Every structure is written in C-alpha cells, then in structure tokens.
Amino acid sequence: MPEHVGKIVQVIGPVVDIKFDAENLPDIYNSIEIDMGDNKKLIAEVEQHVGDDIVRTIAMEGTDGLKRGMEAVNTGKPISVPVGENVLGRLFNVLGQTIDEAGDMNADKYYPIHRPAPTFEEQSVQPEMFETGIKVIDLLAPYQKGGKIGLFGGAGVGKTVLIQELINNIAKEHGGLSVFTGVGERTREGNDLYYEMKDSGVINKTALVFGQMNEPPGARMRVALTGLTMAEYFRDKGQDVLLFIDNIFRFTQAGSEVSALLGRIPSAVGYQPTLANEMGALQERITSTKQGSITSVQAVYVPADDLTDPAPATTFTHLDATTVLSREISNLGIYPAVSPLESTSRILDPRIVGEEHYEVANKVKHILERYQELQDIIAILGVDELSDEDRLLVGRARRVQRFLSQAFSVAEQFTGMKGQFVPVKDTIRSFKEILDGKCDDLPEAAFLFAGTIEDVKEKAKKMMES
C-alpha cells in the first residue's frame, strides 16, 4: 500500500477513524480523500491523533456507504478552495465545488481554508469610516473599514433587503466585491437570496458559499472559513470586500456538535471548551491590512433572547458595531427598520468621524429618546396637553424618525421608488437643518423615503401644488 494511503477502522456518524503507517501520519487539518466508487469522493478533515497510528477525522459530507477497510488517501494539504475573479456570480459548497448547475469552474488559484491572521505589521491601524450610503447607519451607528458588525433582527424585518442594499452600494459606489456565506441556515433562504440577487443585478459582484442546516456539522463548521478565504484573496489584491456571515451562531453550534462527537468534555451550557479559541481564529482573520479591507456583517441569532449565553457573548467581544432591526419600526412603515437608539458603533467618536457628525448624531439620539419618553403621555392625554417646547420637539422627532427611512435600489421593483445612495456629508447637513428648526413648516409625509433635505423640499412643494 502506498505510504500516503490509510485504511478506515471505525465510522461513527460523521466521525471516521483511519489508520496510517506511523511515519506517514497526516497533519492536523489535512484533508483526506475516500473513494466511494461511481466517481464520488468523500472529503474528511483530520481533527485528532488518537494513538496507535490512528487519526480521527470529521467528514464534510454524509458518510452513508462507508465501510471499515476502505482506503483513504492523505492529500498532504488542508481543504483548498478556488479564489479569484472566477468565483464571482457562482455558488459554492464548503469544499469550493460549484452547486449552481452552471458548469464546472476553471480556477487559476486555490487557497487552503486554514490560514494565519495578518500580522500586526500588515494590519492597518488607522480607524476609518466605511460609507454605506444608508443614512440611519452612516449617521448613528457607522461601520468601520475592516470592522465587524452584528446584525440583529427577527424574521421578516428586512435583514435580507439590508444585506442586498449593502452589496449593491459597495459594488456601485466603491467598486467593491462581496462574499455571502450561509452558515447552517435554511436552504430555501439561500435559494431565495440567489434569485433575488440575480433579479437585482448584484450577483456578478458576489460569491456565495453555503453550508446549510441539513449538512453534517463538519461542513457547517468550516463553511465560514471557505467564504473568508475567498474574501481574503480579494483583500490582498487591494479591494474593499464585504463579508456576510448568516448566521454566526450556527458556526458556534456546529463547533459544539463536532466537539461532542470528538469526545471533548463540554464547558458552560454544553458548548465546546474551545469556543473562544475557534471564534477568535475566525474573527482575527477579518481585518484591514495596508492592501485592502474585509468588512464583515454577521447576522447574530440569540438563543432564547439570552444575551449572556456563551455563543452570542463570545461574538460580542469581537464586534465594532451593532445594527438592530426593530419590528416596532417596521410596523410604522419605516424602512430600513433600523432601531436608532439600540444600534451602536465604537467609531462614533469625534476623533474618527469628526466633531460635526458626532454632535448631530447625539442630538438626533437625544430628540428620539425624549420623544419615546413622551409617548406614554401622548397616548393618554394627547399632544395638545404637552408644553409648547415639548410639542415642538415631538414635531421635529417625528420628522427625524421619518427622514431615517430610505428607498433602496434593490427594492425598486417592489416599491416603485428610485433607490438612493446618500453621501454622509449630505446626511449630516440634512439632519442639521431639521434639528435647527428650518423644516418645521414642512409636512411630515414629505420626509418619508426621501434622500436628502432637498428631496424633502421638492416633495413638500409637489404636495402643496396638488
């Protein structure tokens, strides 16, 4: 038997034990190929050396049909996936194989999915704002270039549309690229996203990688690394890349399943003892370098809404900003339904975004907080019972709240409203005018889904004429 070939000695679900010669044991994280016949190869990844020249591996696909005594080939390298321009517009699985039935892909380069994080010397230390063109985000919870953003929200509040608009804006305004990684979510959602991206025209600037709910835990645990590896290639070529991970909790969940299968003693709440280490290995690779940046937007599922659960708590330590989508705001018909008071950002700091931006954002938050406090009084007694000062504040707050809405390009075919990318300087100037009372005489309805303050005035003029 050739030196790099071993034999399967045990199969327990997705865990496959393989015996090699003592001198030729494969390294940890090496990929192992098992020939299943009918031109089908099963890939497994080495996780442990268990003694007696046996390695314990986790299969990336179902192990149906595996038998003891079957031959397994050590490839001598980790799982490697295609990178480069050719991956754009295509759908991949954890192994970098295309799953969109659009033919095979010829890739010039393959990168291993396990790679070191950039060194301190390579990293960019200058915090810089990442302009999204979405007013509520840019003003109140701005994203950092190379930062990590947590996206919180229940079903049907607009997470997917927000993600698509971000992909659209980075492609059209910054010429940037995106990688979408579906980790342990529903296959139907991935399918819908693919066709929606096709319809909205952003698919050619995006690579999609999926390891869905029905796949073995090994695939769900590693698929985030596959997407990240594709994004790293573009970053190292000088691009600004958006990396979407939906859902980061499923990455932890898959790691927990694998840990249990490997026989590790669980830690708090049944999670793997290596939770912080696994999360750190992924998150530390997502950063800005002197060449380019990877800005990551991660959907975060919070089990039972318990923020102290180890999985979300470990994720929070890595986040630079949070974007919280609120059902209350979507019920008001305001989209994007981003909660201006619950969303946060580490870079909303006068030294980074500038004094004027910081001041306007704080005033907007203050006026909305006060409006929230007054809502109980308004519900019981009505607006007329408020003092003149509070009545004026409520009027401005309602205008601000409506002006935080925005028409999206990717939703144009459903809403009939032309989408707008609003530069951050226009956003600041427009909100300043509302706060200074220059728009108190304009009707509230004119502020809904307007881009800049000039659009509001234009809409108000048309309303007056009609």
Curated annotation (Swiss-Prot):
Its main location: membrane. Gene3D superfamilies: 2.40.10.170, Bovine Mitochondrial F1-atpase, Atp Synthase Beta Chain, Chain D, domain 3, P-loop containing nucleotide triphosphate hydrolases. SUPFAM superfamilies: C-terminal domain of alpha and beta subunits of F1 ATP synthase, N-terminal domain of alpha and beta subunits of F1 ATP synthase, P-loop containing nucleoside triphosphate hydrolases. Pfam families: ATP-synt_ab, ATP-synt_ab_N, ATP-synt_VA_C. Belongs to the ATPase alpha/beta chains family. InterPro entries: AAA+_ATPase, ATP-synt_VA_C, ATP_synth_F1_bsu, ATPase_alpha/beta_chains, ATPase_F1/V1/A1_a/bsu_N, ATPase_F1/V1/A1_a/bsu_N_sf, ATPase_F1/V1/A1_a/bsu_nucl-bd, ATPase_F1/V1_b/a_C. It comes from Clostridium acetobutylicum (strain ATCC 824 / DSM 792 / JCM 1419 / IAM 19013 / LMG 5710 / NBRC 13948 / NRRL B-527 / VKM B-1787 / 2291 / W). The keyword S-adenosyl-L-methionine does not apply. F-type ATPases have 2 components, CF(1) - the catalytic core - and CF(0) - the membrane proton channel. CF(1) has five subunits: alpha(3), beta(3), gamma(1), delta(1), epsilon(1). CF(0) has three main subunits: a(1), b(2) and c(9-12). The alpha and beta chains form an alternating ring which encloses part of the gamma chain. CF(1) is attached to CF(0) by a central stalk formed by the gamma and epsilon chains, while a peripheral stalk is formed by the delta and b chains. It catalyses: ATP + H2O + 4 H(+)(in) = ADP + phosphate + 5 H(+)(out). Transmembrane segments: none annotated. Its EC number is 7.1.2.2. One of its GO terms (cellular component) is plasma membrane. GO terms for molecular function: ATP binding; ATP hydrolysis activity; proton-transporting ATP synthase activity, rotational mechanism. This is ATP synthase subunit beta. Keywords: ATP synthesis, ATP-binding, Cell membrane, CF(1), Hydrogen ion transport, Ion transport, Membrane, Nucleotide-binding, Translocase, Transport. It is a peripheral membrane protein. Produces ATP from ADP in the presence of a proton gradient across the membrane. The catalytic sites are hosted primarily by the beta subunits.
